[in-house]
Regions:
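M14 metallocarboxypeptidase catalytic domain recognition
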Residues: 1-380
């Protein structure tokens, strides 16, 4: 295979990190040599803002239709917290392996009464940049539409939203500075030179069984023990502390265009299947209404693949009745390099889905038999 001919790249592959080289080769082999991204280096530089000056801006000037570095995201979080004191509270739940703070935004009208809560995390896997872009988009839309959108106002008045824009902060920075396709955390291993753990295989639920690897050099490495990663441990501790309030857990990933719910680790039906299936159906229907983009939905094990130690399964096993994982756009054409031009439509449609899931928490679930009308919704 002649990489120079089949990929038409304007850079030497030898200058790229090994994981990127392998990704390109496999990507090309899997598609018979078709060129989907003719200039990979240019696309990466465009998304990272390489060669351009990106100055800190006020919230009103913040561009939600480009990808942002961790520094920019955290500066934005501080600004959001400063300018919306009546609806936003910002706090840290711990520190990453490399010592960076793990910031969370709490959205919702301040009240003394008990409120249910929704947890949303993005950026568990470093290379999935559309995740942090969505978390920022959600915050922006929730705050800006609070005054005129009756649905959003009701959600903010009756629920709290815990938003973690970048879960895997160390890995996210590494994906900006060194390896665009980096997935894992950045923790060191005592026996191997390979670094990092898959933060979505490190949870204490069927840990390191099917769909996870015990080898530190693999992308799905489960870690030396459950919650070995300080990022995972911090989120797990927070959710345990607030499990009586948190009724929905939503983790944003990419890519595949799917909405998944438990179980990931086995082929079995969850006890509240009817309620969760109905919520998923309503969510993808709302998503489809924006631009006609089709999402598959169902149990992760049968819809995507079997995996163990996932945050979604852990959340469900720890008493959060509605646990979901989104796999956002696309289905492989751009993959992890989703163009910035698609941030707006991707986030707009996903916003509809998350609002629908959240609205469902304010209603009593009808536990009768739920059946999908495939003739009415053939795209699902």
């Amino acid at each position: 295979l002649s990489l120079s001919l089949s990929l038409s790249l304007s850079l030497s592959l030898s200058l790229l990190p090994l994981t990127v080289q392998i990704y390109i080769i496999l990507y090309c082999l899997g598609r018979g040599g078709w060129v989907f991204i003719s200039n990979l280096q240019k696309e990466i530089e465009k998304q990272t803002g390489y060669g351009s000056s990106r100055k800190r801006r006020s919230e009103s000037q913040y561009d939600y239709e480009v990808y942002h570095s961790l520094e920019e995201i955290q500066s934005w979080m501080f600004e959001i917290n400063r300018t919306h004191p009546h609806l936003v509270d910002m706090f840290s739940i711990g520190r990453s392996y490399e010592g960076r703070p793990l910031y969370v935004l709490q959205l919702g009208k301040r009240t003394r009464s008990y409120k249910k809560a929704v947890w949303i995390d993005c950026g568990v896997h470093a290379r999935e940049w559309i995740g942090p872009a969505f978390c920022q988009w959600f915050v922006k839309e929730a705050l800006h539409s609070y005054q005129y959108d009756s649905v959003m106002r009701r959600l903010m008045n009756q629920l709290n939203f815990y938003i973690m824009p970048v879960f895997n902060v160390d890995g996210y920075i590494f994906s900006w500075t060194t390896d665009r396709f980096w997935r894992k955390t950045r923790s060191k291993n005592r026996k191997y030179h390979c670094r990092g753990v898959d933060a979505n295989r490190n949870w204490k639920v069927k840990w390191c069984e099917e769909g996870a690897s015990s080898h530190p050099c693999d992308d799905t490495y489960c870690g030396p023990f459950p919650e070995s990663e300080p990022e995972v441990k911090a989120v797990a501790k927070f959710l345990r502390k607030h499990k009586k309030r948190v009724k929905a857990y939503v983790s944003i990933h990419a890519y595949a265009q799917m909405l998944l719910y438990p179980y990931s680790y086995k082929y079995a039906t969850i006890p509240n299947f009817n309620c969760v299936e109905s919520a998923a159906h309503n969510a993808v229907t709302a998503l489809y209404s924006a631009y006609g983009v089709r999402y598959r939905y169902g149990p992760a094990s049968t819809t995507l693949y079997v995996s163990s130690g996932s945050s979604m399964d852990w959340a469900y096993r720890n008493g959060i009745p509605y646990a979901f994982a989104f796999e956002l756009r696309d289905t492989g054409y751009f993959g992890f390099l989703l163009p910035e031009a698609l941030i707006n439509p991707t986030c707009t449609e996903t916003m509809r889905a998350v609002k629908t899931i959240s609205s469902g928490l304010l209603k009593k679930c009808e536990t009768g038999t739920y059946q999908l009308d495939r003739e009415r919704y053939p795209y699902l």
